């Protein structure tokens, strides 16, 4: 019940507020009409009997703001209680504001005091009849602007009408022309007076609050921002902004640190670049200095070599070789040692292949040993071994002095320098050749000259020994190793400038220890022979290696003193 009564009271207050607003607008319309005709005399009086008898002057029954919804203002933005802050009558309000008429016109307050039932506003009409506007006529008028004159010596009030509402009057069935020629009475009730009394008292520049709804809306919008939900949202937004601000500060610090690190890195890079530039300059200086030293050393070596070797220039003769002369000498001595060992191993394999029942082969070997008063038996001694070794070495090293290892052979290249380089290149390519590679592809695949050399030496050995049996694989492998070492030794010897020479000695030559090595000296020494030694047989040849001599191995005979 209480809630329903509250709703009814609110609705009633709203309706009263709307009615008060309509009445106030009607009053303003009448005052504005008075302002539009300044030449005529304005009078406020009670309605006469003739005007009361006119049909148009009769008050319209039960007219209210609900009959004119177009002019019903909306007061949602204003509290309803604002219309009741001061309960004054229209006459009191006008008395307080000092609004009156001069020049013989009666005061507006006196006119309102004499009226008992209805209060009317009498206004002059164009046909010199007084036209009375009632509140019903005011409802047909549009909203008006109210203002007063600024003259201090004149108490008259100026009013101006803005527009009309003919469209709405036609819909209601009223004749506008008849209304212009008739006197209409607007009833002014106490509620109307209350509306009029609610006007502000300040003079000059007074503005109604309902004329400026934007101000109210602005106040309302300001109140919206003060609501708790908006406050919470603003707090959240402020927190978010604060967090974002801290994040931005953190990013700024990180950016500053990154910039500092970058500057430091750039500084280090610049320092390193400058250091590298200095090092490159020093390196170029050292390279040029080393080149000058090498050139000076080469020239000095050439001069010394010419003085020591009688015009042979060791620096010039090996200047174009990929390795130095010392390396070549060491390699040559190593190949000589390998060749001697490989020939001994081949001889052992050959002797192991001899069959004692093969009388033809044994007879051929005895024929070779007969000049030395020796014969081949199963229990042969070292002397027989040395003699057989001498026979094999003589066959293998035959024609070693020739440039192509052949009797009366001719060089392939006429330019000695190019020939030396070709010999060394062939030496390097065949140095690591193995027996398994030869079994797969043959010696001719790797070198035609080496293949021809192997065929010639094998044929010479077979012819010398009158060998009639086929060679076994083991014997062939031993022969390949021996032939390879001798061939490499020849290639390397002819890679020098001039080529290294072979040292051979003939039989019955006087023994010279500087060039010969007696392999049977211990046995002869045990025989206490003191006579001059003579070469019996050369077992292994020697070589002339530049300014040195690699002695040959021989067997000597000694004559006893008796």
Swiss-Prot record:
Q: Which domain of life is it from?
A: Eukaryota
Bias (Low complexity) occurs at 36-61
> Which InterPro entries does the entry mention?
GIL1_IRKI_C (IPR056813), IRKI-like (IPR042316)
Q: Does the keyword Coiled coil belong to this entry?
A: yes
Q: Which gene encodes it?
A: IRKI
Coiled-coil stretches: 246-306
Instruction: Write out the tissue specificity statement of the associated record.
Output: Highly expressed in root tips, shoot apices and developing flowers.
Task: Read off the lineage from the record.
Answer: Eukaryota, Viridiplantae, Streptophyta, Embryophyta, Tracheophyta
Any idea what this protein is called? Answer: IRK-interacting protein
Entry keyword set: Coiled coil
- A Pfam entry, by short name: GIL1_IRKI_C
* Location of region: Disordered: 29-61, 303-322
Assembly, in brief, is: Interacts with IRK.
Q: What happens when the gene is disrupted?
A: No visible phenotype under normal growth conditions.
The keyword Coiled coil appears for this protein: yes
Induction data: By auxin.
């Amino acid at each position: 019940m209480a809630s329903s009564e509250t709703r009814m009271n609110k609705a009633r207050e709203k309706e009263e507020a709307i009615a008060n607003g309509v009445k106030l607008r009607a009053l303003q319309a009448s005052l504005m009409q008075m302002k539009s005709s300044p030449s005529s005399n304005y009078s406020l009086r009670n309605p006469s009997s003739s005007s009361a008898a006119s049909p148009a002057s009769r008050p319209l029954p039960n007219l209210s703001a609900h009959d004119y919804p177009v002019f019903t203002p909306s007061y949602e933005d204003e509290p309803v209680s604002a219309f009741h802050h001061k309960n004054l009558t229209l006459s009191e309000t006008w008395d307080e504001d000092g609004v009156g008429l001069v020049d013989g016109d009666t005061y507006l307050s006196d006119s309102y005091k004499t009226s008992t039932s209805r209060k009317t506003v009498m206004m002059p009409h164009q046909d010199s009849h007084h036209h009375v506007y009632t509140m019903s006529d005011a409802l047909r008028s549009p909203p008006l602007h109210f203002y007063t004159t600024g003259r201090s010596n004149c108490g008259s009030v100026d009013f101006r009408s803005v527009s009309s509402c003919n469209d709405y009057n036609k819909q209601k069935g009223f004749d506008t022309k008849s209304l212009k020629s008739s006197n209409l009475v607007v009833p002014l009730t106490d509620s109307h007076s209350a509306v009029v009394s609610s006007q502000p008292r300040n003079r000059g520049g007074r503005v109604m609050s309902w004329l400026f709804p934007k101000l109210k809306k602005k106040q309302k919008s300001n109140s919206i921002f003060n609501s708790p939900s908006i406050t919470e949202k603003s707090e959240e937004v402020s927190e978010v902004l604060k967090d974002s601000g801290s994040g931005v500060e953190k990013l700024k610090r990180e950016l500053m640190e990154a910039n500092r690190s970058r500057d430091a890195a750039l500084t280090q890079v610049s320092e390193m670049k400058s250091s590298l530039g200095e090092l490159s300059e020093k390196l170029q200086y050292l390279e040029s200095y080393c080149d000058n030293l090498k050139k000076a050393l080469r020239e000095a070596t050439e001069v010394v070599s010419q003085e020591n070797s009688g015009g042979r220039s060791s620096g010039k003769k090996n200047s174009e070789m990929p390795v130095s002369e010392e390396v070549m000498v060491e390699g040559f001595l190593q190949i000589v040692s390998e060749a001697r060992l490989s020939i001994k191993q081949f001889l052992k394999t050959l002797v192991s292949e001899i069959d004692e029942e093969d009388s033809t082969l044994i007879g051929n070997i005895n024929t070779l040993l007969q000049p030395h008063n020796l014969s081949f038996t199963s229990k042969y001694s070292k002397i027989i071994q040395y003699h057989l070794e001498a026979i094999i070495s003589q066959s293998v090293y035959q024609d070693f002095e020739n440039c192509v290892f052949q009797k009366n052979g001719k060089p392939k290249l006429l330019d000695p320098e190019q020939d030396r380089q070709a010999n060394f290149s062939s030496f390097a390519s065949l140095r690591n050749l193995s027996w398994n590679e030869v079994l797969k592809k043959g010696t001719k695949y790797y070198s035609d000259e080496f293949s021809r050399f192997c065929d010639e030496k094998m044929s010479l050995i077979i012819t010398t020994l009158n060998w009639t049996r086929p060679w076994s694989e083991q014997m062939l492998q031993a022969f390949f190793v021996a032939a390879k070492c001798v061939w490499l030794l020849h290639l390397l010897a002819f890679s020098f400038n001039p080529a290294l020479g072979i040292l051979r000695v003939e039989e019955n030559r006087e023994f010279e220890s500087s060039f010969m090595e007696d392999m049977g000296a211990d046995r002869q020494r045990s025989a206490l022979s003191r006579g001059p030694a003579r070469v019996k047989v050369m077992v292994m040849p020697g070589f002339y290696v530049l300014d040195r001599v690699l002695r040959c191995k021989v067997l000597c005979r000694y004559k006893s003193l008796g």
